[in-house]
Amino acid sequence: AGGSAAATVTTAGDTPVVGDIPTQTAPPTSTNLNAWLSSFYTAEDKRQTKFPEALPADAQPFELLVINICSLSWADVDAAGLMSHPLWSHFDIQFKDFNSATSYSGPAAIRLLRASCGQTSHKNLYQPAGNQCYLFDNLAKLGFTQHLMLGHNGQFGNFLKEVREQGGMQAPLMDQTGLPVSLLGFDGSPVYDDTAVLQRWLQTIEKDSNPRSATFFNTLPLHDGNHFPGVSKTADYKVRAQKFFDELDAFFTELEKSGRKVMVVVVPEHGGALKGDRMQVSGLRDIPSPSITNVPAGIKFFGMKAPHQGAPIEITQPTSYLAISELVARAVDG
């Protein structure tokens, strides 16, 4: 389950107040924890987003861009001293307790691509899911063209294979020809410049005659071991994060000026464990502890008739992928 499951129970006096998650009141023995986890999966199994059967006549077409970022948690943002970066105030909705439920890339992408159903066990990520669970398939049924974009080659850890086989994303990989390489991965593979990739996305959807599209974009500029070409030492995390946040912020400003109708959803995969915690040393992600799974997810709407004014709406209660699917379904429904 990973992350802050305990935080899902708040207390009014001495009585636990539960949202949609089983209460946690028994002593933390192995038997009790396993029983709770089993009841959690049973509860999650009943949950799914209901997408409309067809689009309402007055539904506004828009582009959905889901940005899945490797190695970024709130704890990492804090450790890098970037909590007050202007990017964070650029969102309309910000999730302060979003649980990625995993500390590895493949499972994180699968969970996001299957966001329209409740959480499942790690093992079940590698079993087929019902068609209703695949967020991008739900959108395709409503006429959205699917796009797949990577800021890397997708080979490490069979990432692209898992996105296709377990995530159900069959769209062709967006053309990477001629993209500038800003970093090299620890295995020497190219990590493409994010501004260039986002511009390539804009060019691609501008050529597309369908005004409705849904893009899954996975990028890893913050991954441990990335280094600048010609330098063997791992590039400083803060330097890379500052550049990436600056680029995303500038891209948001560009979208605002364009008038294009876009819903951008940012969901990091998991943290980079920049600082250690009581469970494991920095850099280790074997245990999906809350400092790794509490990630800065956010949503920004562009081209709205009445854009959100002021500071972002902060969602402080525990959330995960189903919340993203719900918000996308509501946006689609007009």
Tell where the protein language model's regions lie, with residue ranges:
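Phosphate/oxyanion-binding loops and surfaces in catalytic or ligand/nucleic-acid-binding neighborhoods
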Residues: Q119, L142, H270-D277, M304, ...
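Histidine-centered active-site microenvironments of extracellular/periplasmic hydrolases
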Residues: K261, V267-H308
